A protein has these predicted regions:
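Basic nucleic-acid-binding interfaces
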Residues: 1-135
Length: 135
């Protein structure tokens, strides 16, 4: 069994699978942009009690598996991340601006799933295999 997270009053193990899509599925995410987006996540996440477990991308979306604390307001974190990463990615990679719609990087919506329905290793493998070339 995996080690549980804990705080003063609880023990927990909360895994989430997040999918964030580029607005109108514009094809702008390459390896350097994904790596920078991941660095931004790793900078912001600790302030919200979030730990990154897996990160991968396809050309128009990213998959993230992370752990969080019960008190974490996930929607606030996700919106803060999307806002900061959008601003920084457009500044650091100005060439993507011409592919975006009205300067908007991320779609306003996102998909957030708990990892309780499938074993974490299955989700981990799924994320690791995202973006692989299909024959």
């Amino acid at each position: 069994m995996e080690n549980m997270d804990h705080n003063a009053h609880s023990v927990y193990l909360m895994y989430y699978h997040l999918i964030m899509v580029v607005k109108y599925r514009r094809k702008v995410i390459n390896d350097p942009i994904s790596e920078r987006a991941k660095e931004i996540w790793e900078y912001i996440a600790p302030r919200y009690g979030i730990v990154l477990e897996e990160w991968n991308h396809d050309i128009d979306h990213v998959h993230v598996m992370f752990r969080a604390q019960p008190k974490t307001e996930l929607s606030k974190f996700i919106n803060a991340y999307k806002s900061a990463s959008s601003r920084l990615l457009k500044k650091e990679y100005p060439e993507i601006r011409e592919k975006l719609w009205k300067e908007t990087f991320w779609s306003q919506s996102f998909c957030l799933l708990t990892a309780g329905g499938a074993p974490v290793e299955v989700i981990r493998q799924y994320i690791e295999n995202q973006g692989e070339k299909k024959n």
